[in-house]
Amino acid sequence: MRRTKIVVPIMLTELTELEKVSVSDYLSADIVEWRADFLSADDIFEMAPKFFEKFKESKILFTLRTVREGGNIQVSEKKYLQILQEILKFEPDYIDVEYFSHGPSFAALKNYREKIVLSYHNFDEVPTDLTSRLIKMHEEGTAFVKVAVMPERECDVLDLLQITRDMTLEYGNHFISMAMGDLGRLSRISGYLTGSCWTFAGLENSSAPGQISLKETVEILDLLENELA
């Protein structure tokens, strides 16, 4: 049995695309992530009941990744919060909230801490203050804390692995971390060492640079983790 949960994003750009999605393609995933930021707010609202009905047997993470954090949608604070509040009516298992980009929205959603994946994405670097950011996020008491950063050299990846391990040992097993790009691929399959409890894998199109396919991720983690469970 694997320790690391595999999350597979679904990125739809039009309402009609949901009909073409086969639930069976995602059976190897532990969690399905609806990356809704490729749709307009109105289309998100229209698709939501159909999406949650279609994947009612799956655990669902809802993510609205904004342009500021590497996503595809640019919305006001008010609209960001409105979308998340509307989605919460469908009782997703988890909902991503961008902590440093949308702090006011998180403050309004604190009653949903047990569902929140508090996230921070940096597509430029591994910031020198990453540890302090992780501690600040951890102190908010959410279900998970997620960081994705861009390494410039090999030591950046090793630093992230060590920071994740240190945070897990100190504060518990609710951290999710990854170094993006080809250089960071090791971070996506090393959760059994670092304590990072989720990894993200692509079905076909990846949602982040360096993402490994679902099939390959399952094979690698089964090889690395099955004897450790």
Curated annotation (Swiss-Prot):
Coiled coil: none annotated. One of its GO terms (biological process) is chorismate biosynthetic process. One of its GO terms (molecular function) is 3-dehydroquinate dehydratase activity. Its EC number is 4.2.1.10. It catalyses: 3-dehydroquinate = 3-dehydroshikimate + H2O. Keywords: Amino-acid biosynthesis, Aromatic amino acid biosynthesis, Lyase, Schiff base. CDD domains: DHQase_I. It holds the Pfam family DHquinase_I. Belongs to the type-I 3-dehydroquinase family. Involved in the third step of the chorismate pathway, which leads to the biosynthesis of aromatic amino acids. Catalyzes the cis-dehydration of 3-dehydroquinate (DHQ) and introduces the first double bond of the aromatic ring to yield 3-dehydroshikimate. This is 3-dehydroquinate dehydratase. It comes from Lactococcus lactis subsp. cremoris (strain SK11).
